[in-house]
């Protein structure tokens, strides 16, 4: 999966079911998981993270979920066709035997630890590797340490066969220049593949993730509508749209992601997250969103995908001003 220096392709990981479950108090049903995972898989997202938001094997004190880890794993596995499935484990909060369950259903496991305590999670790393799981080390609360401390942890992880190490902006503290410094430090210390997981407390999650990619990160995390702990995560619709504008991720169906975000996530949490996917689509295509409500109504009345109508309108419309009549002509043409 590592790309050449001449053309690096980002690898997008969606954690709507895992980190996004904070936004619904860990109450996703197994039907929710099937629908969300199925939509993401169909859209071409290559890595999908599931399981309890805090950690697989979470005790009741971490917040009871609507279903067990195994029920979530089975639900996701029943619908996924192409994506790799994984979960997060926090060794300080979970029993090592939980790794065995992950090995029965999943493809990868992300092990959370602060940068100065990597040796404490070595038993979990070895157990996961013995189960054939792709292991990623998540250096949580990265902002607490200087970049060279993360670099040393990343080098140690690579020495024991770990291929992926993440910078994790747990508290949403980073600015883009911080994301760059930390990613570059990890990249410079070993040939480990670097990931970036951003939170949106300063409304910088998308900008930080793009900067992390430019600095050399390969794995980029996001969630539908930016659902997640606290202020939320990097909104995957924005992230994919921005990367596609740069010529990346041609195999990902952006319209399908827009539709999944609205159908699967809107209204699900009492807290407001993210930007309306249709507004993102208007921005992506360079259309003035003044007529978004007319377009929505016309598309829905015709039984068409709003995202598809936006895309077709952008292809057909060449003028400076988009009128309701312009939209109506597009809809009629799509129905013909």
Curated annotation (Swiss-Prot):
Look up the EC number in the record and give it: 4.1.1.112
Instruction: Tell me the keywords, alphabetical order.
Output: Lyase, Manganese, Metal-binding
The record's section on InterPro entries has:
2-IPM_HCS-like, Aldolase_TIM, PYR_CT
Q: Which PANTHER family match?
A: 2-ISOPROPYLMALATE SYNTHASE 1, CHLOROPLASTIC-RELATED, HOMOCITRATE SYNTHASE-RELATED
Activity regulation details: Activity is abolished upon incubation with Chelex and EDTA.
Q: What biological processes does GO assign it? A: L-leucine biosynthetic process
Gene that this sequence comes from: mhpE
Which residues are noted in the entry as Mn(2+)-binding? 19, 197, 199
Please list the reactions this protein catalyses. Answer: oxaloacetate + H(+) = pyruvate + CO2
The UniProt function text for this chain reads: Exhibits oxaloacetate decarboxylase activity. Lacks any detectable aldolase activity with 4-hydroxy-2-oxopentanoate (HOPA), 4-hydroxy-2-oxohexanoate (HOHA) or other 4-hydroxy-2-oxoacids.
As cofactor, the record names: a divalent metal cation
What is this protein identified as?
Answer: Oxaloacetate decarboxylase
Organism expressing this protein natively: Mycobacterium tuberculosis (strain ATCC 25618 / H37Rv)
- Cofactor stoichiometry and binding remark: Activity is metal ion dependent and can be restored upon addition of excess Mn(2+).
Q: How does it assemble?
A: Homodimer.
Q: Where is this site: Transition state stabilizer?
A: 18
Pyruvate carboxyltransferase domain residues: 10-258
Reading the lineage from the top rank, the first entry is Bacteria
**Similarity comment text for this entry:** Belongs to the 4-hydroxy-2-oxovalerate aldolase family.
GO MF annotations, alphabetized: 2-isopropylmalate synthase activity; metal ion binding; oxaloacetate decarboxylase activity
